[in-house]
């Protein structure tokens, strides 16, 4: 189906929605508006896009035009949850019920808006979805700048030192795990965590975590972004109910109970991790087990899938050389000529380009200058400021020859040393750790903090998953120009979600 046909259909949607489209997705809406205006003067009216949005925030919601194209061309389906295996049900105390998302209406079911009757029916079906997007963005505004410090500090702490390896980190996934850790601790143990997360109290943390979760939850048949949480308990211990209820109500945490260290309990634990990450981290999950000494364990996950607003065409792919730290390697590069709305950003030691996703999110690619390593760049305050700046001064509209290697990168890391450098220390020391909100048992400590993540990029879009496992044991030790932006040497990437939340960041040394 041609883009022009879809644009004609767009023209028939109510002025209210079209004006809102300009507000939510200004670049794409203006292009369509300009084309429509040459055929009909009464198109988009005089609505204007907001100015001064943060460079990481591309739009408030998925505009109708983008979703029309995504649904009609890609036939995207949402990630399906709720089908728990019998292995899990045998251990379940409480299983979280995710909010039911209103589906984005398929324009094909409404004759692609070819009549007034179909237009009205589409608008009626569209209204609940639209209301949910507004709610997501109202939650996003509640996040504010309080998390900027955590995003910056943790990205630097967990990505540096990759050397020749790829490294992938999901800040939002680790954030949710740390927020739950704060809930099960007290005293200085809790204070160190909430200080890192940029809040003054656990009550403020709950409001912040709710905003982050709600703003970045999507499962409407077009967009998929699912944050999952779970709590794993012993069957021979009693735990304090208030904190268990808080974890269930605020973090959508499912609770499971059984014999720690048993084969069946570990099978259930691994099943939950695999189900929540679509089976894309099975090799890492295989190594995640709960020991006989485990008092409790927390797990958080994210499953994310999005299509490019403008997909790559595989016929334009070419084989080229990627200059890996381990030596030159041949890889397949995708190509796009960004001749409409392309913007090049730069700093003293890097250049950056944004590629938009069809869910109001973006993926950014940060390329160190020649002679500058990724590790060196991660030590620079400027690149960290770039992640969270309201507006970046060094930018220019350009026609960009964009070359991106197809990649599937993953990593698993131990977060403990990184968390200690970030100021979270007491939970690792059995003589200092305070877990009194969940149990009166003394001498416990955080013995495990593992994080695994994977990001796959191809012609159609992005799929990304991550999990974090934390285990508590008994105490033991302006002018249009052209530029070529060829990502043919190690680079950084970032997938930014609703409300400037970094969903995934990573280092690609070996595409």
PLM-predicted stretches and their roles:
Residues 79-193, 476-480, 507-508:
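Flexible propeptides and autoinhibitory/regulatory segments associated with cysteine proteases
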Residues 10, 27, 57-81, 470:
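Single-pass transmembrane signal-anchor helices and their membrane-water interface zones
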Residues 70-86, 93, 443, 451-454, ...:
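Non-catalytic interaction/Regulatory regions outside core domains
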Residues 88-114, 135, 164-174, 181, ...:
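Non-catalytic, conformational "gating/processing" segments within enzyme and secreted inhibitor domains
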Residues 192-195, 237:
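Mid-length scaffold segments of soluble, non-membrane domains
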Residues 83-85, 383-389:
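Soluble, non-membrane globular domain cores that form compact, hydrophobic packing
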Residues 298, 351-366, 478-511:
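Extended hydrophobic
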Residues 1-50:
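Disordered, charged N-terminal biogenesis/targeting segments of membrane/secreted proteins
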């Amino acid at each position: 189906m041609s883009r022009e046909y879809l644009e004609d259909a767009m023209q028939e949607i109510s002025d209210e929605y079209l004006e809102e489209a300009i507000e939510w997705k200004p670049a794409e809406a203006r292009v369509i508006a300009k084309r429509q205006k040459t055929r009909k003067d009464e198109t988009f009216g005089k609505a204007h896009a907001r100015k001064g949005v943060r460079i990481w925030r591309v739009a408030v919601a998925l505009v109708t035009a983008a979703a029309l194209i995504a649904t009609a061309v890609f036939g995207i389906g949402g990630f399906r949850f709720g089908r728990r295996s019998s292995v899990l049900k045998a251990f379940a105390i409480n299983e979280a019920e995710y909010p039911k998302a209103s589906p984005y209406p398929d324009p094909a079911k409404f004759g692609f808006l070819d009549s007034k009757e179909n237009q009205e029916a589409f608008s009626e079906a569209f209204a609940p979805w639209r209301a949910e997007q507004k709610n997501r963005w109202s939650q996003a505004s509640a996040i504010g700048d309080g998390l900027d410090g955590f995003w910056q500090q943790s990205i630097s702490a967990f990505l540096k030192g990759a050397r020749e390896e790829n490294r992938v980190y999901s800040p939002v996934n680790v954030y949710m795990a740390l927020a739950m850790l704060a809930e099960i601790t007290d005293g200085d143990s809790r204070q160190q965590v909430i200080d890192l997360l940029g809040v003054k109290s656990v009550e403020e943390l709950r409001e912040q975590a709710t905003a982050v979760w709600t703003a970045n939850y999507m499962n409407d048949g077009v967009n998929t972004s699912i944050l999952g949480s779970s709590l794993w308990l012993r069957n021979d211990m009693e735990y304090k109910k208030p904190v268990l209820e808080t974890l269930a109500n605020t973090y959508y945490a499912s609770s499971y109970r059984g014999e720690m260290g048993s084969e069946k309990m570990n099978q259930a634990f691994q099943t939950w991790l695999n189900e929540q990450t679509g089976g894309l981290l099975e090799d890492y999950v295989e190594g995640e087990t709960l020991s006989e000494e485990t008092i409790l364990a927390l797990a958080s996950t994210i499953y994310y899938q999005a299509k490019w607003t403008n997909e790559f065409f595989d016929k334009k792919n070419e084989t080229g050389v990627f200059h890996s730290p381990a030596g030159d390697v041949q890889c397949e590069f995708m190509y796009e000529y960004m001749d409409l709305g392309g913007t090049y950003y730069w700093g003293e030691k890097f250049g950056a380009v944004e590629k938009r996703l069809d869910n109001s999110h973006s993926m950014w690619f940060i390329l160190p200058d020649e002679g500058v390593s990724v590790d060196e760049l991660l030590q620079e305050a400027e690149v960290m400021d770039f992640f969270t700046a309201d507006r970046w001064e060094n930018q220019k509209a350009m026609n960009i020859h964009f070359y991106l290697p197809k990649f599937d990168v993953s990593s698993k890391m131990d977060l403990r040393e990184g968390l200690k450098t970030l100021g979270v220390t007491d939970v690792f020391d059995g003589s200092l750790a305070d877990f009194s909100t969940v149990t009166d048992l003394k001498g416990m400590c955080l013995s495990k903090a593992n994080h695994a993540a994977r990001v796959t990029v191809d012609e159609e879009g992005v799929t990304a998953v991550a999990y974090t496992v934390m285990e508590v044991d008994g105490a033991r030790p302006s002018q249009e120009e052209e530029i070529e932006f060829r990502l043919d040497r190690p680079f950084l990437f970032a997938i930014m979600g609703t409300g400037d939340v970094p969903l995934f960041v990573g280092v690609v040394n070996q595409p």
